Amino acid sequence: MNRDLFFKIFLLFLFISNFKMGSAQYFGSSAMKYKPQYDPDFKPAFLELQKFYHDVSQSPDKTELIICLERTKGYNYHYKTLIYKDGTGHDEENYYAVERICKILLWVVGGYKFYIAGSDILPARLREDYQKNGKRKFDYFFFKDVYENYVEIVACKKEEIPELKLEDIPVSSFLNGNRIGFDAGGSDRKVSAVIDGEVKYSKETVWNPKTYSDPNYHIDGIMDSFNQACEHLPTVDGVGISTAGVVVDNKIMVAALFGKVSKDDYEKKIKTIYLDCVKKLEEKYNKKIPVVVANDGDVTALAGLMELNKKEGILGIAMGTSQAGGYITKDSKLTGWLNELAYVPIDFNENAMKDMWSQDIGIGEKYFSQEAVIKLAIKAGVKFEEDLTPANKLKQVQNMIESENEKDRKIAENIFSDMGIYLGYTIPFYCHFYDFQHLLVLGRVVSGKGGNIFVEKAKEVLQNEFPEIAKKVQIHIPDEKSRRVGQSVAAAGLPEVK
Protein backbone atom coordinates (compact mmCIF):
# COMPACT_ATOMS: atom_id res chain seq x y z
CA MET A 1 0.00 0.00 0.00
CA ASN A 2 1.23 3.53 -0.78
CA ARG A 3 2.81 4.93 2.42
CA ASP A 4 0.99 8.28 2.21
CA LEU A 5 -2.34 6.53 1.75
CA PHE A 6 -1.56 4.22 4.67
CA PHE A 7 -0.97 7.15 7.02
CA LYS A 8 -4.16 8.90 5.93
CA ILE A 9 -6.19 5.75 6.53
CA PHE A 10 -4.40 5.18 9.83
CA LEU A 11 -5.21 8.68 11.11
CA LEU A 12 -8.79 8.47 9.84
CA PHE A 13 -9.27 5.11 11.55
CA LEU A 14 -8.08 6.45 14.89
CA PHE A 15 -10.19 9.58 14.54
CA ILE A 16 -13.40 7.68 13.69
CA SER A 17 -12.85 4.91 16.23
CA ASN A 18 -12.57 7.41 19.08
CA PHE A 19 -16.01 8.80 18.33
CA LYS A 20 -17.48 5.32 17.99
CA MET A 21 -16.21 4.56 21.49
CA GLY A 22 -17.64 7.84 22.77
CA SER A 23 -14.23 8.69 24.18
CA ALA A 24 -11.84 11.62 23.96
CA GLN A 25 -8.96 9.67 25.47
CA TYR A 26 -6.71 10.05 22.43
CA PHE A 27 -7.16 13.79 22.00
CA GLY A 28 -4.72 14.81 24.69
CA SER A 29 -2.65 13.32 27.46
CA SER A 30 -5.00 14.73 30.13
CA ALA A 31 -7.26 11.72 29.56
CA MET A 32 -4.50 9.09 29.63
CA LYS A 33 -5.44 5.92 31.48
CA TYR A 34 -1.85 5.48 32.65
CA LYS A 35 0.55 8.06 34.00
CA PRO A 36 4.10 7.36 35.17
CA GLN A 37 4.17 7.61 38.96
CA TYR A 38 7.49 9.44 39.00
CA ASP A 39 6.86 11.46 35.82
CA PRO A 40 3.15 12.38 35.88
CA ASP A 41 3.53 15.25 33.38
CA PHE A 42 4.62 12.92 30.57
CA LYS A 43 2.90 13.97 27.32
CA PRO A 44 3.24 11.26 24.65
CA ALA A 45 4.14 12.71 21.27
CA PHE A 46 1.63 10.47 19.51
CA LEU A 47 -1.31 11.74 21.54
CA GLU A 48 -0.26 15.37 21.30
CA LEU A 49 0.17 15.27 17.52
CA GLN A 50 -3.10 13.42 17.18
CA LYS A 51 -4.86 16.05 19.30
CA PHE A 52 -3.42 18.76 17.05
CA TYR A 53 -4.58 16.88 13.94
CA HIS A 54 -8.07 16.41 15.40
CA ASP A 55 -8.43 20.07 16.39
CA VAL A 56 -7.26 21.28 12.98
CA SER A 57 -9.58 18.87 11.16
CA GLN A 58 -12.56 20.52 12.88
CA SER A 59 -11.54 24.02 11.79
CA PRO A 60 -12.79 25.78 8.64
CA ASP A 61 -9.31 27.31 8.39
CA LYS A 62 -7.46 24.05 7.77
CA THR A 63 -5.09 23.31 4.91
CA GLU A 64 -2.71 20.53 3.93
CA LEU A 65 0.98 20.75 4.71
CA ILE A 66 3.47 18.60 2.81
CA ILE A 67 6.99 18.04 4.09
CA CYS A 68 9.61 16.33 1.97
CA LEU A 69 12.93 15.47 3.60
CA GLU A 70 15.69 14.71 1.10
CA ARG A 71 19.06 13.02 1.63
CA THR A 72 21.88 11.74 -0.57
CA LYS A 73 21.21 10.44 -4.10
CA GLY A 74 17.81 12.14 -4.09
CA TYR A 75 16.21 9.64 -1.70
CA ASN A 76 13.44 11.28 0.27
CA TYR A 77 10.45 10.87 2.54
CA HIS A 78 7.04 12.57 2.35
CA TYR A 79 4.98 13.54 5.38
CA LYS A 80 1.51 15.02 5.02
CA THR A 81 -0.67 16.50 7.72
CA LEU A 82 -3.24 19.22 8.32
CA ILE A 83 -2.39 22.63 9.75
CA TYR A 84 -4.23 25.88 10.26
CA LYS A 85 -3.93 28.38 7.42
CA ASP A 86 -1.33 31.08 7.98
CA GLY A 87 -2.52 34.15 9.86
CA THR A 88 -5.73 32.67 11.29
CA GLY A 89 -4.69 33.01 14.93
CA HIS A 90 -2.98 29.62 15.21
CA ASP A 91 0.53 30.30 13.93
CA GLU A 92 2.17 29.32 17.24
CA GLU A 93 0.23 26.04 17.42
CA ASN A 94 1.28 25.28 13.85
CA TYR A 95 4.89 26.07 14.60
CA TYR A 96 5.09 23.95 17.74
CA ALA A 97 3.64 20.87 16.03
CA VAL A 98 5.58 21.20 12.77
CA GLU A 99 8.87 22.05 14.50
CA ARG A 100 8.55 18.79 16.44
CA ILE A 101 7.57 16.86 13.30
CA CYS A 102 10.64 18.13 11.43
CA LYS A 103 12.91 17.21 14.32
CA ILE A 104 11.35 13.72 14.42
CA LEU A 105 11.83 13.24 10.68
CA LEU A 106 15.48 14.28 10.86
CA TRP A 107 16.34 11.59 13.38
CA VAL A 108 13.96 8.83 12.24
CA VAL A 109 14.45 9.08 8.47
CA GLY A 110 17.52 11.27 8.12
CA GLY A 111 18.28 13.94 5.56
CA TYR A 112 19.35 17.53 5.24
CA LYS A 113 16.98 19.32 2.85
CA PHE A 114 13.39 20.08 3.80
CA TYR A 115 10.86 21.07 1.14
CA ILE A 116 7.78 22.55 2.81
CA ALA A 117 4.56 23.33 0.93
CA GLY A 118 1.36 24.73 2.40
CA SER A 119 2.68 27.58 4.53
CA ASP A 120 4.83 30.66 4.04
CA ILE A 121 5.30 31.35 7.75
CA LEU A 122 6.58 27.93 8.85
CA PRO A 123 9.62 27.68 6.52
CA ALA A 124 10.79 31.11 7.65
CA ARG A 125 10.42 30.17 11.34
CA LEU A 126 12.23 26.87 10.84
CA ARG A 127 15.02 28.59 8.92
CA GLU A 128 15.66 30.72 12.01
CA ASP A 129 16.01 27.54 14.09
CA TYR A 130 18.32 25.64 11.74
CA GLN A 131 21.32 27.94 11.48
CA LYS A 132 24.65 28.30 13.26
CA ASN A 133 23.19 30.41 16.08
CA GLY A 134 19.64 29.04 16.00
CA LYS A 135 17.69 26.92 18.46
CA ARG A 136 18.56 23.79 16.49
CA LYS A 137 22.21 24.61 15.87
CA PHE A 138 23.23 21.18 17.19
CA ASP A 139 21.21 19.46 14.46
CA TYR A 140 22.38 22.01 11.90
CA PHE A 141 26.04 21.06 12.45
CA PHE A 142 25.49 17.37 13.21
CA PHE A 143 23.81 16.66 9.90
CA LYS A 144 26.62 18.45 8.08
CA ASP A 145 28.89 15.68 9.39
CA VAL A 146 26.38 13.00 8.41
CA TYR A 147 25.35 14.15 4.92
CA GLU A 148 28.09 16.68 4.17
CA ASN A 149 25.42 19.37 3.81
CA TYR A 150 23.93 21.75 6.34
CA VAL A 151 20.22 21.45 7.10
CA GLU A 152 18.32 23.53 4.56
CA ILE A 153 14.69 24.70 4.59
CA VAL A 154 13.06 25.32 1.19
CA ALA A 155 9.62 26.90 0.85
CA CYS A 156 7.85 25.69 -2.26
CA LYS A 157 4.51 25.02 -3.91
CA LYS A 158 2.92 21.57 -3.67
CA GLU A 159 3.64 20.82 -7.31
CA GLU A 160 7.34 21.57 -6.67
CA ILE A 161 7.71 18.85 -4.04
CA PRO A 162 10.17 16.24 -5.39
CA GLU A 163 8.64 12.93 -6.41
CA LEU A 164 8.76 10.29 -3.69
CA LYS A 165 11.96 8.24 -3.88
CA LEU A 166 12.38 5.55 -1.23
CA GLU A 167 15.51 3.47 -0.83
CA ASP A 168 15.27 -0.33 -0.62
CA ILE A 169 18.39 -2.23 0.40
CA PRO A 170 17.78 -5.98 0.12
CA VAL A 171 19.25 -8.16 2.84
CA SER A 172 19.47 -11.92 2.73
CA SER A 173 18.76 -14.34 5.54
CA PHE A 174 19.78 -17.35 3.41
CA LEU A 175 23.52 -16.66 3.72
CA ASN A 176 24.41 -18.33 0.42
CA GLY A 177 28.05 -18.44 -0.61
CA ASN A 178 31.20 -17.75 1.38
CA ARG A 179 30.71 -14.77 3.65
CA ILE A 180 32.37 -12.76 6.36
CA GLY A 181 30.28 -11.08 9.02
CA PHE A 182 31.92 -8.43 11.21
CA ASP A 183 30.48 -6.63 14.23
CA ALA A 184 32.36 -3.59 15.59
CA GLY A 185 31.49 -2.72 19.17
CA GLY A 186 32.94 -0.38 21.74
CA SER A 187 34.68 -3.10 23.78
CA ASP A 188 35.04 -6.03 21.40
CA ARG A 189 34.92 -6.99 17.74
CA LYS A 190 33.27 -10.15 16.49
CA VAL A 191 33.79 -11.97 13.21
CA SER A 192 32.09 -14.98 11.66
CA ALA A 193 32.92 -17.12 8.64
CA VAL A 194 29.75 -18.50 7.05
CA ILE A 195 29.42 -20.97 4.17
CA ASP A 196 25.93 -21.44 2.72
CA GLY A 197 24.32 -20.51 6.01
CA GLU A 198 26.54 -22.71 8.18
CA VAL A 199 28.78 -20.93 10.67
CA LYS A 200 32.28 -22.32 10.25
CA TYR A 201 34.04 -19.95 12.62
CA SER A 202 33.23 -17.21 15.13
CA LYS A 203 35.66 -15.20 17.22
CA GLU A 204 35.23 -12.37 19.70
CA THR A 205 38.32 -10.20 20.26
CA VAL A 206 38.72 -7.53 22.91
CA TRP A 207 39.62 -4.09 21.59
CA ASN A 208 39.24 -0.50 22.79
CA PRO A 209 38.63 1.72 19.76
CA LYS A 210 37.31 4.64 21.78
CA THR A 211 40.69 5.15 23.44
CA TYR A 212 42.95 5.13 20.35
CA SER A 213 43.64 8.11 18.10
CA ASP A 214 45.83 6.22 15.61
CA PRO A 215 43.70 5.10 12.61
CA ASN A 216 46.10 2.20 12.06
CA TYR A 217 44.96 0.64 15.33
CA HIS A 218 41.44 0.43 13.95
CA ILE A 219 42.51 -0.69 10.47
CA ASP A 220 44.77 -3.41 11.89
CA GLY A 221 42.02 -4.64 14.20
CA ILE A 222 39.48 -4.96 11.40
CA MET A 223 41.95 -6.71 9.10
CA ASP A 224 42.97 -9.07 11.89
CA SER A 225 39.35 -10.20 12.23
CA PHE A 226 38.92 -10.44 8.45
CA ASN A 227 42.05 -12.57 8.10
CA GLN A 228 40.92 -14.88 10.90
CA ALA A 229 37.70 -15.54 9.00
CA CYS A 230 39.52 -16.00 5.69
CA GLU A 231 41.43 -18.95 7.14
CA HIS A 232 38.13 -20.83 7.31
CA LEU A 233 36.83 -19.90 3.84
CA PRO A 234 37.93 -21.09 0.37
CA THR A 235 37.13 -17.61 -0.98
CA VAL A 236 35.09 -14.56 0.01
CA ASP A 237 31.86 -13.82 -1.88
CA GLY A 238 30.51 -11.08 0.36
CA VAL A 239 31.26 -9.06 3.49
CA GLY A 240 28.65 -7.66 5.84
CA ILE A 241 29.58 -5.19 8.55
CA SER A 242 27.64 -4.13 11.64
CA THR A 243 28.95 -1.00 13.32
CA ALA A 244 27.99 1.50 15.95
CA GLY A 245 27.61 4.98 14.46
CA VAL A 246 25.82 6.72 11.62
CA VAL A 247 26.22 4.96 8.27
CA VAL A 248 25.48 6.59 4.91
CA ASP A 249 26.30 4.87 1.61
CA ASN A 250 28.52 2.34 3.42
CA LYS A 251 30.56 5.15 4.94
CA ILE A 252 30.81 5.67 8.70
CA MET A 253 29.97 9.37 8.91
CA VAL A 254 29.82 9.87 12.68
CA ALA A 255 30.87 7.35 15.33
CA ALA A 256 31.89 7.53 18.97
CA LEU A 257 33.91 4.36 18.28
CA PHE A 258 36.50 6.54 16.55
CA GLY A 259 36.00 9.61 18.71
CA LYS A 260 39.70 10.00 19.54
CA VAL A 261 40.75 10.16 15.89
CA SER A 262 41.59 13.66 14.64
CA LYS A 263 39.17 15.30 12.23
CA ASP A 264 41.73 15.18 9.43
CA ASP A 265 42.52 11.48 9.94
CA TYR A 266 38.83 10.69 10.28
CA GLU A 267 38.13 12.27 6.91
CA LYS A 268 41.06 10.53 5.21
CA LYS A 269 41.09 7.08 6.83
CA ILE A 270 38.04 6.39 8.98
CA LYS A 271 35.05 7.48 6.95
CA THR A 272 35.71 4.74 4.36
CA ILE A 273 37.61 2.39 6.68
CA TYR A 274 35.35 -0.61 6.10
CA LEU A 275 35.29 -0.17 2.32
CA ASP A 276 39.07 0.22 2.28
CA CYS A 277 39.55 -2.96 4.31
CA VAL A 278 37.32 -4.91 1.92
CA LYS A 279 39.40 -3.57 -0.98
CA LYS A 280 42.38 -5.36 0.57
CA LEU A 281 40.37 -8.59 0.42
CA GLU A 282 39.53 -7.86 -3.21
CA GLU A 283 43.24 -7.56 -3.96
CA LYS A 284 43.88 -10.81 -2.11
CA TYR A 285 41.25 -12.77 -4.04
CA ASN A 286 41.51 -10.78 -7.28
CA LYS A 287 37.73 -10.29 -7.49
CA LYS A 288 35.01 -7.79 -6.74
CA ILE A 289 33.42 -8.49 -3.34
CA PRO A 290 29.96 -7.10 -2.49
CA VAL A 291 29.96 -5.25 0.83
CA VAL A 292 27.22 -3.69 2.94
CA VAL A 293 27.94 -1.58 6.02
CA ALA A 294 24.97 -1.11 8.34
CA ASN A 295 24.26 0.45 11.70
CA ASP A 296 24.32 -2.14 14.47
CA GLY A 297 20.69 -1.36 15.28
CA ASP A 298 19.60 -2.46 11.81
CA VAL A 299 21.68 -5.62 12.11
CA THR A 300 20.08 -6.38 15.46
CA ALA A 301 16.72 -6.21 13.71
CA LEU A 302 18.05 -8.50 10.98
CA ALA A 303 19.24 -10.99 13.60
CA GLY A 304 15.73 -10.94 15.03
CA LEU A 305 14.27 -11.51 11.58
CA MET A 306 16.48 -14.54 11.09
CA GLU A 307 15.56 -15.92 14.52
CA LEU A 308 11.82 -15.39 14.04
CA ASN A 309 12.01 -16.65 10.45
CA LYS A 310 8.98 -14.60 9.41
CA LYS A 311 8.36 -12.18 6.56
CA GLU A 312 7.22 -9.42 8.88
CA GLY A 313 8.53 -5.98 9.79
CA ILE A 314 10.85 -5.76 12.78
CA LEU A 315 11.82 -2.72 14.84
CA GLY A 316 14.66 -3.20 17.30
CA ILE A 317 15.53 -0.87 20.15
CA ALA A 318 18.59 -1.31 22.33
CA MET A 319 18.48 0.23 25.80
CA GLY A 320 21.91 0.70 27.31
CA THR A 321 24.12 3.76 27.73
CA SER A 322 21.82 5.43 25.22
CA GLN A 323 19.01 4.23 22.95
CA ALA A 324 19.67 2.68 19.55
CA GLY A 325 17.21 1.69 16.85
CA GLY A 326 17.08 -0.54 13.80
CA TYR A 327 14.43 -1.50 11.27
CA ILE A 328 13.87 -4.25 8.71
CA THR A 329 10.79 -4.06 6.46
CA LYS A 330 8.36 -6.94 5.98
CA ASP A 331 10.08 -7.48 2.61
CA SER A 332 13.41 -8.04 4.40
CA LYS A 333 14.91 -4.74 3.32
CA LEU A 334 16.78 -1.90 4.95
CA THR A 335 15.49 1.59 4.23
CA GLY A 336 18.62 3.73 4.42
CA TRP A 337 16.97 5.65 7.25
CA LEU A 338 18.93 7.06 10.16
CA ASN A 339 16.88 5.37 12.94
CA GLU A 340 18.65 7.40 15.64
CA LEU A 341 15.77 7.03 18.09
CA ALA A 342 17.83 8.41 20.98
CA TYR A 343 17.26 11.94 19.65
CA VAL A 344 13.65 11.59 18.53
CA PRO A 345 11.25 13.66 20.70
CA ILE A 346 8.69 11.33 22.28
CA ASP A 347 7.54 13.57 25.16
CA PHE A 348 5.96 16.97 24.44
CA ASN A 349 6.00 18.09 28.07
CA GLU A 350 7.66 21.51 27.94
CA ASN A 351 9.36 20.80 31.28
CA ALA A 352 10.77 17.44 30.20
CA MET A 353 14.40 16.64 31.01
CA LYS A 354 16.88 18.47 28.81
CA ASP A 355 19.65 16.67 26.97
CA MET A 356 22.80 18.70 27.46
CA TRP A 357 24.46 17.48 24.25
CA SER A 358 21.67 18.14 21.76
CA GLN A 359 20.06 20.91 23.86
CA ASP A 360 16.60 19.46 23.25
CA ILE A 361 13.97 18.06 25.60
CA GLY A 362 11.82 14.95 25.66
CA ILE A 363 14.12 12.85 23.46
CA GLY A 364 14.09 9.05 23.46
CA GLU A 365 17.39 8.59 25.27
CA LYS A 366 15.86 10.04 28.45
CA TYR A 367 13.07 7.43 28.38
CA PHE A 368 14.66 4.24 27.02
CA SER A 369 18.19 3.97 28.41
CA GLN A 370 20.01 3.82 31.72
CA GLU A 371 19.55 7.59 31.88
CA ALA A 372 15.80 7.02 32.16
CA VAL A 373 16.29 4.65 35.09
CA ILE A 374 18.53 7.16 36.87
CA LYS A 375 16.15 10.06 36.14
CA LEU A 376 13.16 8.23 37.61
CA ALA A 377 15.19 6.89 40.55
CA ILE A 378 16.23 10.40 41.57
CA LYS A 379 12.61 11.55 41.35
CA ALA A 380 11.66 8.58 43.54
CA GLY A 381 14.17 9.65 46.18
CA VAL A 382 16.86 7.04 45.53
CA LYS A 383 20.28 8.17 46.77
CA PHE A 384 23.39 7.40 44.72
CA GLU A 385 27.01 7.75 45.79
CA GLU A 386 28.62 10.63 43.95
CA ASP A 387 31.38 8.55 42.35
CA LEU A 388 29.06 5.88 40.93
CA THR A 389 29.12 5.49 37.15
CA PRO A 390 25.77 5.54 35.31
CA ALA A 391 26.12 1.78 34.69
CA ASN A 392 26.55 1.14 38.42
CA LYS A 393 23.60 3.39 39.23
CA LEU A 394 21.51 1.23 36.92
CA LYS A 395 22.84 -1.87 38.65
CA GLN A 396 21.90 -0.41 42.04
CA VAL A 397 18.29 0.04 40.94
CA GLN A 398 18.19 -3.42 39.38
CA ASN A 399 19.51 -4.90 42.63
CA MET A 400 16.74 -3.11 44.54
CA ILE A 401 14.19 -5.32 42.77
CA GLU A 402 15.76 -8.29 44.55
CA SER A 403 15.93 -6.45 47.89
CA GLU A 404 14.33 -7.79 51.05
CA ASN A 405 13.43 -4.19 51.85
CA GLU A 406 9.86 -3.88 50.59
CA LYS A 407 10.08 -0.10 50.10
CA ASP A 408 13.22 -0.35 47.96
CA ARG A 409 11.76 -3.22 45.98
CA LYS A 410 8.54 -1.31 45.29
CA ILE A 411 10.40 1.81 44.18
CA ALA A 412 12.47 -0.20 41.70
CA GLU A 413 9.38 -1.99 40.39
CA ASN A 414 7.63 1.36 39.90
CA ILE A 415 10.61 2.73 37.98
CA PHE A 416 10.48 -0.06 35.41
CA SER A 417 6.69 0.12 35.35
CA ASP A 418 6.93 3.84 34.54
CA MET A 419 9.29 3.04 31.69
CA GLY A 420 6.80 0.46 30.46
CA ILE A 421 4.18 3.21 30.37
CA TYR A 422 6.58 5.30 28.30
CA LEU A 423 6.93 2.44 25.83
CA GLY A 424 3.22 1.64 25.73
CA TYR A 425 2.45 5.17 24.58
CA THR A 426 5.46 5.35 22.26
CA ILE A 427 4.84 2.16 20.26
CA PRO A 428 1.88 3.78 18.39
CA PHE A 429 4.21 6.70 17.66
CA TYR A 430 6.79 4.32 16.18
CA CYS A 431 3.98 2.63 14.20
CA HIS A 432 3.27 6.00 12.60
CA PHE A 433 6.66 5.84 10.85
CA TYR A 434 7.57 2.15 10.79
CA ASP A 435 5.44 -0.73 9.53
CA PHE A 436 6.38 -3.52 11.94
CA GLN A 437 4.81 -6.52 13.64
CA HIS A 438 7.63 -7.34 16.05
CA LEU A 439 9.42 -5.06 18.51
CA LEU A 440 12.74 -6.41 19.79
CA VAL A 441 13.88 -4.85 23.07
CA LEU A 442 17.55 -5.36 23.94
CA GLY A 443 20.23 -4.07 26.27
CA ARG A 444 21.30 -4.22 29.88
CA VAL A 445 18.46 -1.95 31.01
CA VAL A 446 15.94 -4.71 30.30
CA SER A 447 17.91 -7.59 31.81
CA GLY A 448 16.43 -9.39 34.81
CA LYS A 449 13.11 -8.77 36.55
CA GLY A 450 13.10 -5.09 35.63
CA GLY A 451 12.88 -5.96 31.95
CA ASN A 452 9.94 -8.28 32.56
CA ILE A 453 8.07 -5.57 34.49
CA PHE A 454 8.88 -3.07 31.73
CA VAL A 455 7.53 -5.27 28.93
CA GLU A 456 4.43 -6.44 30.79
CA LYS A 457 3.42 -2.86 31.63
CA ALA A 458 3.96 -1.79 28.00
CA LYS A 459 1.72 -4.64 26.87
CA GLU A 460 -0.93 -3.63 29.41
CA VAL A 461 -0.94 -0.03 28.19
CA LEU A 462 -1.20 -1.15 24.57
CA GLN A 463 -4.03 -3.55 25.33
CA ASN A 464 -6.12 -0.99 27.19
CA GLU A 465 -5.29 2.16 25.22
CA PHE A 466 -4.51 0.91 21.71
CA PRO A 467 -6.10 -2.57 21.34
CA GLU A 468 -5.76 -2.63 17.55
CA ILE A 469 -2.03 -2.02 17.79
CA ALA A 470 -1.76 -4.56 20.61
CA LYS A 471 -3.15 -7.16 18.21
CA LYS A 472 -0.61 -6.22 15.55
CA VAL A 473 2.64 -5.77 17.51
CA GLN A 474 4.44 -8.42 19.56
CA ILE A 475 7.19 -7.42 22.00
CA HIS A 476 10.22 -9.69 22.39
CA ILE A 477 13.31 -9.69 24.63
CA PRO A 478 15.87 -12.01 22.96
CA ASP A 479 18.13 -13.89 25.34
CA GLU A 480 21.70 -12.65 25.68
CA LYS A 481 23.25 -15.75 24.12
CA SER A 482 21.27 -15.53 20.88
CA ARG A 483 21.95 -11.79 20.65
CA ARG A 484 25.73 -12.07 21.07
CA VAL A 485 26.18 -15.02 18.75
CA GLY A 486 23.72 -13.78 16.16
CA GLN A 487 25.02 -10.26 15.52
CA SER A 488 28.10 -11.02 13.40
CA VAL A 489 26.34 -13.95 11.71
CA ALA A 490 23.43 -11.68 10.79
CA ALA A 491 25.90 -9.12 9.44
CA ALA A 492 27.21 -11.79 7.07
CA GLY A 493 23.75 -11.84 5.48
CA LEU A 494 23.79 -8.15 4.56
CA PRO A 495 25.29 -8.23 1.04
CA GLU A 496 23.33 -9.73 -1.83
CA VAL A 497 25.44 -12.53 -3.31
CA LYS A 498 24.41 -13.87 -6.72
List PLM regions with ranges.
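Glycine/GP-enriched mid-protein hinge/lid loop-to-helix segment characteristic of carbohydrate kinases
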Residues: 25-79, 93, 125, 165-172, ...
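Long, compositionally biased, glycine/small-hydrophobic-enriched stretches that function as flexible linkers
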Residues: 25-161
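Short glycine-aspartate micro-motif
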Residues: 113-115, 177-183, 236-240, 292, ...
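Glycine-rich phosphate-binding loop and adjoining helix at the ATP-binding site
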Residues: 87-98, 105-109, 120-157, 206-220, ...
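Classical Sec-dependent N-terminal signal peptides that target proteins to the secretory pathway
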Residues: 1-24
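Phosphate/ATP-binding catalytic cores across multiple sugar-kinase/actin-like superfamilies
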Residues: 418-436, 494
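Short glycine-rich phosphate-binding loop at a beta-alpha junction
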Residues: 108-120, 235-244, 434-445
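Short, well-ordered amphipathic alpha-helical segments that serve as non-catalytic structural scaffolds
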Residues: 100, 216-232, 277, 422, ...
